[in-house]
């Protein structure tokens, strides 16, 4: 396409507005009739803050084409409707479009959202794209269309937990051969000071992680690796994404080329320094080269994974040999989508084969939930699933205890409100050294994007305690404004995704999606502030269903009652799901917390 055609295409696209720069309001002045609707009003806008979203002028928040609203007219109408919404009404949003306001009651959700849901036979990208081109549909990803995205921080702790557990499983009894002689596994010579880039007690000191993808989700990888004590190399095909991660301090430095990257890896591994390195290039081209060099005696990674947007072969994965400009032009032309998808799929197969090659060298290799194994399998890589997904490999024991990506946002816009809530979490859980260390690392290393927010994995029995404590802080005036509490859809009981969160369930119920539907119904009945039900997040059309929940702590007694219900029920539904599948840890957790599970004694 020529420049004139590109400009005309953008001018005609109702989802693009070059003049828009959206930021959520701060402070205590209300634009809506209550803090409950004000919270949705601010969080929708926060999702499109240029410091938060990947491509805000296109309404894209993260994850390929994960949008906050269907088009700009819908965005404006949602805000207008929220400003007028009464406390006994609920707004219904269908794939990013406000379609109705109905009389409910004060404890009902103020917003109910359904995004990207298709009847199973039609749940594929071809049907989605046909509807999307007509302006009839929207891809909501997980937290994009449910208005609770907080930037890369939203996934950084989960990625950190994954990397740290991988270190414990694979390397707890053997320090890295790259560490200089005389250095301890903590990266310190006896009697010496410790570099600020060294992480004490890490099983990954002197080791490096190889991955790709620096988008909204993948962008958490370098910082997560650093917090876990590892060196990391993340390949990314777009310089703008590398620049974004450098600017927000998720990435430490960029290598000039593959040789420079390997030299930097060796330098920092030898010193036990946890440093993240970005490399501009195509993973389908660079991973095979790294395999070749490793086989020839070069550096071998200690862990291999990937977070490219392989779930969306049109908008998410650059085919090998293509320029970014060619890729963008093909995305804009529906006639090229079939060819683009085919080329991207072939490249994914090459990418996965390289990951399998690393696994054959004895290197732990794990899928991070972007469906790239499925794409490769469909392309003829019949052993694509030889390496596991990250949930069954490292995370499921946490899910069995109702632990997951609990998050909260300060509607005041004041970072001090977050720091005060950090302190409150430490006070509530004085003996949880893991949570204390996480909060200390987060404050030191994580830059806020948009409204100040915090991610902290908490479990059943902890989430509601935190929510009630925050509500009391608001009531007493210790915080400047109410707190929004939410989570990722990637959580203990809110998702069915056979190639990711529910892969390899003990009872074989990987694809049973009753559970996220029950989760959404339960949170609606409990009085959440807004509830969402999505399809296709993370792994693409046809491969997942998942639910989101958000609840506001506004300091009122009514909020306290809702928080006590919703934050117990939400985590409890995850424990229920895993107990039903036969996980003893979940059964024990259910009994400790007094859950009533009729079929489990």
Curated annotation (Swiss-Prot):
Say which domain of life the source belongs to.
Answer: Bacteria
Residues at the active site:
456
UniProt keyword DNA-binding, yes or no: no
Q: Where is this region: Disordered?
A: 179-200
Any one GO CC term of this protein is: cytoplasm
Positions of region (Insert):
172-201
Which Gene Ontology terms describe the biological processes this protein takes part in?
Answer: L-histidine catabolic process to glutamate and formamide; L-histidine catabolic process to glutamate and formate
Identify the InterPro entries for this entry.
Urocanase (IPR055351), Urocanase-like (IPR023637), Urocanase_C (IPR035401), Urocanase_central_sf (IPR038364), Urocanase_CS (IPR023636), Urocanase_N (IPR035400), Urocanase_Rossmann-like (IPR035085), Urocanase_sf (IPR036190)
Show the SUPFAM superfamilies listed in the entry.
Urocanase
Q: How is the cofactor bound?
A: Binds 1 NAD(+) per subunit.
Q: What Enzyme Commission number(s) appear in the record?
A: 4.2.1.49
Give the keywords, sorted.
Cytoplasm, Histidine metabolism, Lyase, NAD
What cofactor does this protein call for? NAD(+)
- Any coiled-coil ranges, and where? none
A Pfam family the protein falls into: Urocanase_C
Kindly list the places in or outside the cell where this protein is found, as annotated in its UniProt entry: Cytoplasm
Reaction catalysed?
4-imidazolone-5-propanoate = trans-urocanate + H2O
Record GO terms (molecular function): urocanate hydratase activity
So where does NAD(+) get bound? 63-64, 141, 216-218, 236, 282-283, 307-311, 317-318, 368, 538
- Metabolic or biological pathway, per its Swiss-Prot or TrEMBL entry: Amino-acid degradation; L-histidine degradation into L-glutamate; N-formimidoyl-L-glutamate from L-histidine: step 2/3
Role summary: Catalyzes the conversion of urocanate to 4-imidazolone-5-propionate.
Q: Which family does it belong to?
A: Belongs to the urocanase family.
Name by which UniProt lists this protein: Urocanate hydratase
UniProt gene name: hutU
């Amino acid at each position: 396409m020529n420049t004139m055609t590109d400009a005309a295409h953008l001018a005609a696209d109702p989802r693009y507005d070059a003049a828009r720069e959206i930021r959520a309001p701060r402070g205590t002045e209300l634009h809506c009739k209550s803090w409950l609707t004000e919270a949705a009003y601010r969080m929708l806008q926060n999702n499109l803050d240029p410091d938060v979203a990947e491509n805000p002028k296109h309404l894209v928040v993260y994850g390929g084409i994960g949008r906050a609203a269907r088009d700009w007219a819908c965005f404006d109408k949602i805000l207008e409707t929220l400003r007028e919404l009464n406390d006994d009404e609920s707004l219904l949003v269908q794939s990013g479009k406000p379609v109705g306001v109905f009389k409910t009651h004060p404890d009902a959700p103020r917003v109910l959202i359904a995004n990207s849901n298709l009847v199973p036979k039609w749940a594929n990208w071809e049907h989605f794209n046909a509807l999307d081109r007509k302006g009839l549909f929207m891809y909501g990803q997980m937290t994009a269309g449910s208005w609770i995205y907080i930037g890369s921080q939203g996934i950084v702790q989960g990625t950190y937990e994954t990397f740290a557990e991988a270190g414990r499983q694979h390397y707890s009894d053997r320090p890295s051969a790259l560490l200089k002689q005389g250095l301890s596994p903590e990266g310190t010579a006896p009697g010496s000071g410790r570099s600020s880039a060294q992480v004490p007690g890490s099983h990954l000191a002197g080791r490096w992680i190889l991955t790709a993808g620096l988008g909204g989700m993948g962008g958490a990888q370098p910082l997560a690796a650093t917090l876990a004590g590892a060196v990391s190399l993340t390949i990314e095909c777009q310089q703008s994404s590398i620049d974004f991660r450098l600017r927000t301090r998720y990435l430490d430095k960029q290598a000039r080329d593959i040789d420079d990257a390997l030299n930097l890896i060796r330098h920092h591994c030898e010193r036990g320094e946890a440093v993240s390195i970005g490399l501009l290039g195509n993973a389908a081209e660079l991973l095979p080269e790294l395999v070749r060099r490793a086989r020839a005696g070069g550096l071998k990674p200690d862990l291999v994974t990937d977070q490219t947007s392989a779930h969306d072969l049109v908008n998410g994965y650059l085919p090998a040999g293509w320029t970014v400009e060619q890729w963008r032009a093909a995305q804009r032309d529906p006639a090229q989508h079939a060819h683009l998808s085919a080329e991207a799929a072939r490249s994914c197969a090459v990418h996965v084969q390289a990951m399998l090659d690393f696994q054959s060298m004895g290197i732990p290799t794990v899928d991070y939930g972007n469906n790239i194994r499925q794409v490769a399998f469909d392309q003829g890589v019949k052993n694509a699933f030889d390496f596991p997904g990250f949930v069954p490999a490292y995370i499921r024991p946490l899910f069995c205890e109702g632990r997951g990506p609990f998050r909260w946002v300060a509607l005041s816009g004041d970072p001090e409100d977050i720091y005060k809530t950090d302190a409150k979490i430490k006070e509530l859980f004085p003996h949880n050294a893991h949570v204390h260390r996480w909060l200390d690392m987060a404050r030191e290393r994580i830059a806020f994007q948009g409204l100040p927010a915090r991610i902290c994995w908490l479990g059943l029995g902890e989430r509601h305690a935190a929510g009630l404590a925050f509500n009391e802080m608001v009531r007493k005036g210790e915080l400047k404004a109410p707190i929004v509490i939410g989570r990722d859809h990637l959580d203990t009981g809110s998702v069915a995704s056979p190639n990711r969160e529910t892969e390899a369930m003990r009872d074989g119920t990987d694809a049973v999606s009753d559970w996220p539907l029950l989760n959404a119904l339960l949170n609606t009945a409990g009085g959440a502030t807004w509830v969402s039900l999505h399809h296709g997040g993370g792994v693409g059309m046809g491969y997942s269903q998942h639910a989101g929940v958000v609840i506001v702590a506004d300091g009122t007694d009514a909020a306290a009652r809702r928080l006590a219900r919703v934050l117990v029920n939400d985590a409890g539904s995850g424990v229920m799901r895993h107990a039903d599948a036969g996980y003893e840890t979940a059964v024990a957790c259910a009994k400790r917390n007094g859950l009533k599970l009729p079929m489990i004694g």
